[in-house]
């Protein structure tokens, strides 16, 4: 028997992570509370909050208070991120010269967003700073681009671990740790299922992949590179999701990770997706629990 019955893996996707909150609202209403949680990127943020206080309404209020605070670095950059403007920053950093594209971003530059914005957000959202202060077992996933390996954290500095998991390559400065260079967990584990697969009997994954890819029209060099990387990431995600016992995939409207102005709609779409699945999910959970109970009784029987 494994240490926990129910595990929950929360995928990464920036603003699309609002859908996690909607799913968790339905779970709480139906007394579905995981015993172990894993999170990548925004999934790590929400997972950490839930592991401290399993109250989705509280989580939503914390995000709303953060977004409405005009003094935050995040708030000052929000206008830049609306309407996909943020997504075009890299495209605007290319210059056409003699029918060729030359990237004119400085060779020493490793980020667009300062790590300070991530740290500020986490400091506001998380009342506790260490894993040991959480009430549900929790694992955070990041990626080491030196080795290509997943990095998993479950002890010590909670805020630092989540910040590493949120370091989107090319956008947020990576963390150097000895020889390691740590970036977003989504690079190696878009939805961190394998991270807790051996820790629980039944694993639910919430997938917030972008969904159907929009059509490209005369893509430039950078758009082709980005699309190729996105396709590779999606294939990795599809393979990974096969290891979950149950997958919920809310409609995230194909939104870019930076579209935080769509947060309320994404929360509602998470609710809708979970409500569609909840009856079947509860049935499967009941069957699995009954099976495990019978197995436990069988092996504990004195022959």
Model-inferred region functions:
Residues 1-40, 48-303:
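Patatin-like phospholipase
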């Amino acid at each position: 028997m494994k240490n926990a019955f129910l595990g929950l893996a929360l995928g990464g996707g920036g603003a699309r992570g609002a859908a996690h909150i909607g799913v968790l609202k339905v779970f709480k209403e139906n007394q579905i509370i995981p015993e172990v949680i894993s999170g990548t990127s925004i999934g790590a943020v929400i997972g950490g909050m839930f592991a401290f206080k399993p109250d989705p309404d509280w989580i939503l209020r914390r995000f709303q208070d953060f977004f409405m605070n005009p003094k935050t670095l995040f708030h000052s950059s929000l206008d830049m991120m609306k309407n996909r403007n943020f997504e075009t920053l890299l495209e605007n950093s290319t210059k056409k010269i003699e029918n060729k594209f030359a990237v004119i971003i400085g060779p020493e530059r490793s980020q667009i967003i300062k790590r300070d914005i991530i740290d500020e957000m986490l400091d506001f959202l998380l009342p506790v700073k260490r894993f040991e202060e959480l009430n549900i077992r929790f694992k955070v996933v990041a990626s080491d681009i030196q080795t290509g390996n997943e990095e998993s954290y479950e002890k010590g500095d909670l805020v630092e671990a989540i910040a590493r998991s949120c370091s989107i390559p090319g956008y947020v400065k990576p963390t150097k740790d000895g020889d390691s260079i740590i970036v977003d967990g989504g690079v190696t584990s878009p939805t961190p299922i394998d991270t807790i697969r051996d820790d629980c009997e039944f694993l639910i994954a919430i997938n917030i992949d972008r969904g159907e890819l929009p059509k490209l029209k005369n893509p430039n060099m950078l758009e082709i590179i980005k699309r190729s990387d996105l396709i590779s990431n999606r294939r990795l995600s599809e393979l990974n999701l096969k290891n979950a016992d149950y997958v919920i995939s809310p409609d995230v409207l194909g939104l870019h990770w930076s579209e935080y102005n769509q947060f309320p709609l994404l929360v509602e779409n998470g609710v809708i997706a979970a409500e569609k699945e909840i009856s079947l999910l509860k049935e499967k959970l009941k069957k699995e629990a009954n099976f495990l109970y019978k197995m436990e009784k069988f092996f504990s029987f004195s022959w």
